[in-house]
Amino acid sequence: MNMGLFYGSSTCYTEMAAEKIRDIIGPELVTLHNLKDDSPKLMEQYDVLILGIPTWDFGEIQEDWEAVWDQLDDLNLEGKIVALYGLGDQLGYGEWFLDALGMLHDKLSTKGVKFVGYWPTEGYEFTSPKPVIADGQLFVGLALDETNQYDLSDERIQSWCEQILNEMAEHYA
């Protein structure tokens, strides 16, 4: 099973999370791709995709993702396992918290992918409906807030990595 971790990062927090995820799962299994430098077309060569996207300003897509956004429509991702993680500021921008994560989930949901890694909303304060499912009980991916809950990020990343590995094992069982 080969995994590609694709991310966009303007302030390095999404990139640092990518590196932590790679180190937990294993550098021999996960290849990092910064969308600033690498084409999203490379996603097609992996069985599993981990995609990291921060939300900017008032619910905007980060610039590296925005630059390749339309290219995602042309990718053949049928049958791939996809785990998403997002970064945002829940207190300063609660009504747009992780909107980009929700938009990425929506964009990929028509591509025949199998999502893993939905994450509980408990412990977060926000009002945006975009990044959640299951009556608001789950985010569509790991939710990180390096502004207000940075002290929880390492534990959340560790737990989420264990969760997605278990969910992938069930898929391949």
Swiss-Prot record:
Looking up InterPro entries in the UniProt record yields: Flavodoxin, Flavodoxin/NO_synth, Flavodoxin_CS, Flavodoxin_lc, Flavoprotein-like_sf
Task: List UniProt keywords, sorted A-Z.
Answer: Electron transport, Flavoprotein, FMN, Transport
Q: Which organism is it from?
A: Escherichia coli (strain K12)
| Lineage of origin | Bacteria, Pseudomonadati, Pseudomonadota, Gammaproteobacteria, Enterobacterales
Q: Does the keyword Flavoprotein apply?
A: yes
Q: Which residues form the Flavodoxin-like domain?
A: 3-165
Q: Which domain of life is it from?
A: Bacteria
- One MF annotation (Gene Ontology) recorded for this entry: FMN binding
What NCBIfam families does this protein map onto? Answer: flav_long (TIGR01752), PRK12359.1 (NF009023)
- Pfam families this protein is in? Flavodoxin_1
Q: What does this protein do?
A: Low-potential electron donor to a number of redox enzymes.
UniProt family annotation = Belongs to the flavodoxin family.
Cofactors needed by this protein, per the record, are:
FMN
What are the disulphide bonds in this sequence? Answer: none
Query: What is this protein's record name?
Result: Flavodoxin 2
Q: Which PROSITE patterns match?
A: FLAVODOXIN, FLAVODOXIN_LIKE
